[in-house]
Amino acid sequence: MGSPRLAALLLSQPLLFICLAVSAQVACPCLPRWTSHCLLAFRVDKHFAGLQCGWFPLLVRKSKSSHEFEVCWRHWTPSPFQRKLLGSPSLSQESHRISTHFLAISHRGLRTKRTQPSAAEGIEHLPGAGSQKHGGPEFSFDLLPEVQAIRVTIPPGPEANVRLCYQWALECEDMSSPFDTQKIVSGGHTVDLPYEFLLPCMCIEASYLQEDTVRHKKCPFRSWPEAYGSDFWKSIRFTDYSQHSQMVMALTLRCPLKLEASLCWRQDPVTPCKILPNATAKESEGWYILENVDLHPQLCFKFSFENSSHVECPHQSGSLPSWTVSMDTQAQQLILHFSTRTYATFSAAWSNPGLGLDSSMTPVYSISQTQGSVPVTLNLIIPFLRQGSCILVWRSDVQFAWKHLLCPDVSHRHLGLLILALLGLTTLLGVVLVLFCRRLLPGPGRTRPVLLLHAADSEAQRRLVGALAELLRTALGGGRDVIVDLWEGTHVARIGPLPWLWAARERVAREQGTVLLLWSCAGPSTACSGDPQTASLRTLSCAAPRQLLLAYFSRLCAKGDIPGPLRALPRYRLLRDLPRLLRALDARPATLATSWSHLGAKECLKSRLELCHLLELEAAKDDYHGSTNSPCGFSCL
């Protein structure tokens, strides 16, 4: 056993087994899962007296550099050589040194893993090892959840390489791109390492830049509640493989954790998922399987770990359900129509609608489809119980099934007559309300008349009053009526002036119209006596249904000629204040714009204004000649 050649021969056998396992891609429980192939060669170096070294080059596919095992021993190595060399992590003699370099290639790519010398003798041969700690670089960190990053601080000293990884049994796997970067940090500086998900197995790893240095790793998030929140469940990929009566879901985890899964049912997306008794799924290498389940969108898996849980409904991918049910009523029977795409047995039983899904009553009616072609439609006829009852329908050939609660409505036969009666009543009520409102409440489209009061005692003044009335009717538009005695001479002569005036006043009050008083300086009158005139004017103001509007022609009456009792009324000088007067008479701008927009409407209004202007001049000449023979008095024009 002291021969170097014999030792090399014995050592080559386990190494050859390792490489053959790698080449054949055989999974070994004690080795990482490798995907590359290697070739093994052994060479014995005889140049050193008393010390024999052997190198085992490893030619790794898709790698630019070669890696090798280096084994050194002295000729006096105690027996058995194989046990002390391969079975013991540290040899009993300080003079024995084992330095190995090997590759561990995981499913995420190529990564070099190094073991360190077991004694201080090996550390002295490392470059720059005198300035490093044997335990790797120290560092501190801060979690920055708002930016999804971890800030790592390296104390003053040499540069260090830092990274984030997910700790598995044999290695700390890199994160997915673009979070798999490694950053070099100078001593006394900080660096932010972004992460995709905050998970309990996430670790922070730091190492110096020299070859074969120890990596210092911290995995502090196992006890952090934040690591089991929404990020934990977002990082898991759920894949549904459910079919027939088997509920299957495969999980792809980023952490080596074992979750618990139970069957639950959820009434709607906002209510909690209620766990069913004795419905725990079996787990096998990330696959969760539950047998004898009716695949329904409201039957879900509830995964839990520690104090965190997540509900995943595997059959909500948009595919059609395996079976559906509809119902129809005929005479005293209820007919259930089952459409199924698989062999199944369906049952139904009457239930009280107030007791929910657990209140089925006997008897139970069933129908099966166990042979023949599918899909198929099955009809189950059930005697009608009573009005207001509901029926439970479920798949009875499985252990876990969702129950449908159907409540037949037999009132649809009278629904047409009821709707027709309601429509007739609604229409009648609407007509009555419209008529009532049109009678009592004047709408915005109803016309309001204008009562024009005057005291024209000459032919020129009467022509001027008629022209003013025609001008107001044309300018107001919208069918507005102007009431003046000159246009109703026959009616005034038949009933008399005073009855006509009171009838016109009542109409204006009923239709919420306006009284316009036209004032001018007339010939001799008893109005100059003072008190009788004041009393008559006050009586006229009180008798008006609304506040009086006073208008006067500037050539027939001056502002100071208006009596004192009437000076408190709104006054309008014609024809200068005609726009203000029209607004006071509730002339709508939309009506004016519509009427004036017709062809010739502006020309008609212009001709009315010119006629009023000419008649005003003619009446002023007549008043001037009459005033030379008698004093001036006040009167209505």
Swiss-Prot record:
<dbReference type="GO" id="GO:0005886">
    <property type="term" value="C:plasma membrane"/>
</dbReference>
<keyword id="KW-0325">Glycoprotein</keyword>
<keyword id="KW-0732">Signal</keyword>
<comment type="subunit">
    <text>Forms heterodimers with IL17RE; the heterodimer binds IL17C.</text>
</comment>
<keyword id="KW-1133">Transmembrane helix</keyword>
<keyword id="KW-0812">Transmembrane</keyword>
<comment type="function">
    <text>Specific functional receptor for IL17C, signaling through the NF-kappa-B and MAPK pathways. Requires TRAF3IP2 /ACT1 for signaling. Crucial regulator in innate immunity to bacterial pathogens.</text>
</comment>
<keyword id="KW-0395">Inflammatory response</keyword>
<dbReference type="InterPro" id="IPR027841">
    <property type="entry name" value="IL-17_rcpt_C/E_N"/>
</dbReference>
<dbReference type="Pfam" id="PF15037">
    <property type="entry name" value="IL17_R_N"/>
</dbReference>
<dbReference type="GO" id="GO:0030368">
    <property type="term" value="F:interleukin-17 receptor activity"/>
</dbReference>
<feature type="topological domain" description="Extracellular">
    <location>
        <begin position="25"/>
        <end position="415"/>
    </location>
</feature>
<keyword id="KW-1003">Cell membrane</keyword>
<feature type="glycosylation site" description="N-linked (GlcNAc...) asparagine">
    <location>
        <position position="307"/>
    </location>
</feature>
<feature type="transmembrane region" description="Helical">
    <location>
        <begin position="416"/>
        <end position="436"/>
    </location>
</feature>
<feature type="domain" description="SEFIR">
    <location>
        <begin position="447"/>
        <end position="583"/>
    </location>
</feature>
<feature type="glycosylation site" description="N-linked (GlcNAc...) asparagine">
    <location>
        <position position="278"/>
    </location>
</feature>
<feature type="topological domain" description="Cytoplasmic">
    <location>
        <begin position="437"/>
        <end position="637"/>
    </location>
</feature>
<protein>
    <recommendedName>
        <fullName>Interleukin-17 receptor E</fullName>
    </recommendedName>
</protein>
<feature type="signal peptide">
    <location>
        <begin position="1"/>
        <end position="24"/>
    </location>
</feature>
<dbReference type="InterPro" id="IPR013568">
    <property type="entry name" value="SEFIR_dom"/>
</dbReference>
<dbReference type="Pfam" id="PF08357">
    <property type="entry name" value="SEFIR"/>
</dbReference>
<dbReference type="GO" id="GO:0006954">
    <property type="term" value="P:inflammatory response"/>
</dbReference>
<keyword id="KW-0472">Membrane</keyword>
<dbReference type="InterPro" id="IPR039465">
    <property type="entry name" value="IL-17_rcpt-like"/>
</dbReference>
<keyword id="KW-0675">Receptor</keyword>
